[in-house]
């Protein structure tokens, strides 16, 4: 009986710990987004900032944009930046971010869909 209670308590504690870690990771991604991406893409991902409108950034809340969103291309763009056909920088490189931070940002963009 004591063993069964101990197992149940351990399982419940593990579930809460996992939920806490996931929540902390989501908070970290939001902070990384706010610090590095929101100036152009907006806190809400709609791209309706002065720079976002000037650069014509995509509305990440749009289902059509989400449907065409490619995680591998987004990862590459975050790491390497993006230039137009005239070699003008449209988005600077964020290669200083870790692979985990970039993966979390891509997941954050996915979470913006309406």
Regions found by a protein language model. Give the residues of each.
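The canonical Cys-X-X-Cys-His
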Residues: 34-43, 105
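Axial heme c-ligation environment in periplasmic c-type cytochrome domains
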Residues: 48-59, 63-64, 76-112
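N-terminal glycine-rich dinucleotide-binding loop that anchors FAD/FMN and/or NAD(P) in oxidoreductases
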Residues: 67
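Sec-dependent N-terminal signal peptides
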Residues: 10-13, 17-20
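Electrostatic cytochrome c docking/interface patches
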Residues: 18-34, 48
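Stable alpha-helical elements in mature extracytoplasmic
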Residues: 29-33, 70, 74, 101-102
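Bacterial N-terminal signal peptides that target proteins for export
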Residues: 2-12
